């Protein structure tokens, strides 16, 4: 049994938070000087894997590509929704011209590498930032992929499903994944109810859907 909440905390602890000179950083990114951050200080997260290879090279560390920080910020937002810097990160991401392309390519790269938990956290961060329903569908899909490999991810997937249902997100997918989880638990009656909700909300009827419904 794997405790995924602990695993997400552990992923968070692998981020290094580097203190930034706020004014210099704003100038670098092109953030106007009148724009203010919520926090007095600014620490940007970066995956330790990038640092360890450059640790003795101060010039390299000073000139780390913004790309690495984009990944760090999305992982931080995705792993800890209460992190005090999140509002500042979202503000920064708004000013980085390549944010959208960068996060999309990072997510598909992590999925190709089968680093699904990283992909999941990047998607969570991206959803928090964009509130894009297509991103939420991907969160559920990647969550289900992790759950198929390891059933102890179920509770996190169910939390995401509940979030979608409680907040009336205009997507049918939460009911499909709910049905799959219920069917796996042997609760066929509840699975059928969820599948009917899925169809009522405009979900596509595929072979899998028909199987749950019989």
Summary of predicted features, one role per range:
Residues 109-110, 141-142, 164, 181:
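Residue-level signature for tetratricopeptide repeat
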Residues 76-82, 116, 124-151, 201-207:
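Short, charge-rich amphipathic alpha-helical segments embedded
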Residues 86-89, 118-126, 152-166, 189-198:
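Alpha-helical repeat scaffolds
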Residues 56-61, 85-104, 164-166, 210-214:
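TPR-adjacent "capping" and linker segments in tetratricopeptide-repeat scaffold/adaptor proteins
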Residues 62-66, 95-104, 130-139, 168-175, ...:
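Generic helix N-cap/helix-start motif at coil->alpha-helix transitions
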Residues 5-78:
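N-terminal accessory interaction module
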Residues 101-129, 214:
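Alpha-helical segment of the N-proximal tetratricopeptide repeat
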């Amino acid at each position: 049994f794997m405790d995924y909440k602990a695993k997400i905390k552990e992923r968070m602890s692998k981020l290094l938070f580097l203190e930034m000179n706020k004014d210099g950083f704003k100038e670098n990114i092109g953030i106007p000087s009148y724009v203010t951050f919520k926090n007095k200080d600014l620490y940007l997260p970066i995956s330790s894997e990038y640092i360890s290879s450059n640790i003795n090279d101060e010039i390299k560390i000073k000139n780390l590509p913004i790309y690495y920080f984009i990944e760090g910020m999305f992982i931080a937002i995705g792993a800890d929704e209460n992190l005090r810097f999140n509002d500042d990160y979202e503000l920064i991401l708004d000013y980085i011209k390549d944010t959208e392309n960068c996060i999309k390519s990072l997510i598909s790269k992590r999925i190709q590498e089968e680093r699904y938990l990283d992909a999941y956290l990047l998607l969570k961060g991206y959803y928090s930032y964009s509130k894009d329903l297509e991103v939420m569908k991907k969160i559920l899909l990647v969550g289900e992929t992790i759950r198929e490999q390891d059933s102890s991810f179920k509770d996190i997937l169910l939390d995401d499903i509940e979030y979608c249902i409680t907040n009336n997100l205009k997507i049918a997918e939460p009911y499909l994944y709910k049905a799959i989880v219920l069917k796996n638990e042997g609760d066929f009656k509840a699975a059928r109810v969820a599948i009917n909700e899925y169809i009522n909300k405009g979900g596509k009827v595929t072979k899998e859907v028909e199987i749950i419904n019989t």
